[in-house]
Amino acid sequence: MYPLVISKITKNTTKSVLISFEVPEAEKERFRFEAGQYLTLETKINEKLVRRSYSICSSIDEGLQVGIKEVPEGVFSTYANRSLLKNDLMMVAPPD
């Protein structure tokens, strides 16, 4: 897992966000991706470490992005939609 800064959060609908990550130059190769790959994100929510995987939904030209839809009682998806902010730090595993 590597700490990546959230460079942008776009509210697509009332229940979904597009999260863009800033990948440091030194990690560009590690975070290269192909269509169909996903990212595993990890953060602490209410003092518990929570990890979820989301499909990458961008082209290489758009940078590293995932879309997250809020689901009922979804701990991570609710947190992502309601609490994450631009410039927050998120632990992210390289694409898989």
Give the predicted meaning of each segment.
Residues D96:
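FAD-binding core/adjacent interface of flavoenzyme oxidoreductases
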Residues M1-D88, A93:
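Ferredoxin-reductase
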